[in-house]
Amino acid sequence: DEMSSRGLGDVYKRQSVNHVVCHGIPGDKILDEGDILNIDVTVILDGWYGDTSRMYFVGEPSMKAKFLTKVTYECLWLGIETVKPGSTTGDIGHAIQTHAETNGLSVVRDFTGHGLGKVFHAPPTILHYGQPNTGDVLEEGMIFTIEPMINSGKYDVKILSDGWTAVTRDKSL
């Protein structure tokens, strides 16, 4: 893999298109005009884990897709803005859930943000829904992801037969 050959360590990539919420397995499917594509990359370097993703549009997206991705991005930043020593994981989730639901969207319950470092899924667990002043208290030096997965329909997901890919149960974006 080109990224590994550049000294970036082990690299794992996932791609999620449209109603694939997360963990989509890369393939040779040709993307269509208006598709939403999320690329999720995990890098392991010298035993340390990194995790990032980025959302793209293929051509011109629908108004619904633009709205969903705009609100999801806002949810991410509202969650980030709550992060400081003494705040809680519930504060993050509450900020995200409130903004999503105020905009008529739903928050996936089955997947979370997570701590990372020498382990990929370490404490704390970052729910993207919840109540303020609940959950783990954040401390200086914690490293974790905030990964809000916001749906235009209901928040229910199902895992496909590959045992990995998660999609919206109602096939909504």
Which residue stretches match the model-derived regions?
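A contiguous pocket-lining binding segment that forms or flanks enzyme active sites
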Residues: 81-149
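Hydrophobic, well-structured mid-protein blocks that either form specific transmembrane helices
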Residues: 48-103
